[in-house]
Amino acid sequence: MSASAVNVNPGRNVVVVGTQWGDEGKGKIVDWLTDHAQGVVRFQGGHNAGHTLIIGGKKTILRLIPSGIMRPGVACYIGNGVVLSPEALFKEIEELESAGIDVQKRLFISEATTLILPYHVAIDQAREARSGAGKIGTTGRGIGPAYEDKVARRGLRVQDLFEPKAFAERLRANLDFHNFVLTQYLGAPAVDYQQTLDMMLSYADRLKPMVTDVSRRLYDENHVGNNLLFEGAQGTLLDIDHGTYPFVTSSNCVAGAATAGAGIGPQKLDYILGITKAYCTRVGSGPFPSELYDADNANRQEEVGLTLAKVGKEFGSVTGRPRRTGWLDAAALRRAIQINGVSGLCITKLDVLDGLDEVKLCVGYTIDGKDADILPRGAYEVSRCEPVYETFGGWKESTVGIKEWNKLPANAQAYLTRVQEVAGVPIDMVSTGPDRDETILLRHPFKV
């Protein structure tokens, strides 16, 4: 084999994952890191999660399109592990292009990506309405039912749109099944076949220029030395397998999902960046050991938790739902680090803790009288966790916009140092505000 046949300088690949229940601030960090990446890849989830970016004081919320779209010249990929609503996609494209951002020439969609259809949305919403107090807290956007169809081999893919006759036949069979569930079990209206067929086929010509073999394209990009950034959605504790089941999302949110959801070999993942807030939040139902505040629970309304919610502007970027807040749970973080193989951490929203008299860190639990130093598996055991806290002095100085570690208040440094000790991996980045430039860099993920 000639030396020229072997690429001695392959591109590096970094995976960004949330280590909590989502909403960790991944979008800002992905955007920040794209100055060293030629491509950004979404590999799971759908338009149920919003990534909020603030660049030059202007706020942008992305739901499907990777955060790299805000950087000129960066290619963006939607992998086969995503479930795609064409309606939501084109709405997002139109919003971005109306702001002068070039999208369609830089966006590439896997032909194997599963489609979200109107009956998925109808089932999602009808189920949630029927569940009453037992609801999971779904966004009602059809994500779960689309993944169900994928696993049941009923799913329709992007590539199926280009075979209209076969698409029509499979759609009819799917609607026979789903309309029976909607009308006979959920007591909801049926979804119209012809209207659905016409709508979905109308997207085919618009989608086709963006559809490609994403897996092959990523391989080729690496081979010529280009760096890729893999952008996770939601968070580890919402993972369908590793989260607080059944209060989870419908996809794998962990770093390993990048391999299956984008079609890249696991040995190609060079660095895993775990994103965690300096405190914790959760949206919807499910156990939350270090919880301080829940607007819907009169027994969980501590003043400091409300302060975190107000200062941190803790409302879902897509749903607008208020988030539950609590102290940073390092025992849960330890679980996420182990599952993801985290190389280093990025702590976000440190500035939200400014002005507190004291800051607490959950370092473990007691469960039925026994000590535990890591989050257990499944919702029922997690719901029995009583947090064990360490308390730190707060700081009155503002950390907003600080870009150097040694300029942080001493108590903030002490708190973060302890988080690093308990987590067992280095803190490589700290976010001190919502803007792209309000960031402390200790080690660059693409240069480690």
Swiss-Prot record:
IMP binds at D23, E24, G25, K26, N48, A49, G50, H51, T139, R153, Q234, T249, R321. It holds the Pfam family Adenylsucc_synt. GO terms for biological process: 'de novo' AMP biosynthetic process; IMP metabolic process. Plays an important role in the de novo pathway of purine nucleotide biosynthesis. Catalyzes the first committed step in the biosynthesis of AMP from IMP. Its main location: cytoplasm. This is Adenylosuccinate synthetase. It comes from Paraburkholderia phymatum (strain DSM 17167 / CIP 108236 / LMG 21445 / STM815) (Burkholderia phymatum). Pathway: Purine metabolism; AMP biosynthesis via de novo pathway; AMP from IMP: step 1/2. The gene is purA.
